[in-house]
Design a protein with these regions (language model features):
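A cross-kingdom feature that marks ATP-driven nucleic-acid transaction machinery
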Residues: 1-103
Length: 103
């Protein structure tokens, strides 16, 4: 399953930076909530390909986590898509894994 393997690749990349990696689940879900030295570093959703069938689910999970952790930005890591979604005062950036992993 490409989705599971892809999520594991993102986890391994995050793990190189910190051990404080968590999962968020309330009404919706966020794949990775990352802290570094006790401070939130990022909110990440992993999606092989964003489309009409999963867009709402992926964004809703991030918006809920952004509200919970009071974060203005979050990321969706994709296989090869780039986009920016501005929802109110929140910004979600979708970017390909190969670009994101260079950071």
């Amino acid at each position: 399953d490409n989705g599971r393997l892809f999520e594991n690749m993102v986890f391994l990349q995050l793990r190189r930076q910190t051990t404080e990696i968590y999962y968020f689940s309330e009404k919706n879900e966020c794949d990775f909530v990352v802290f570094q030295q006790g401070k939130i570093k990022g909110l990440y959703q992993v999606c092989w390909q964003l489309d009409q069938n999963n867009m709402n689910r992926e964004i809703s999970g991030l918006i809920e986590a952004m509200d919970y952790f009071n974060q203005p930005t979050a990321s969706i890591i994709t296989q090869n898509q780039s986009d920016t979604f501005v929802i109110g005062e929140k910004t979600i950036t979708a970017q390909p894994f190969h670009e994101w992993s260079k950071c």
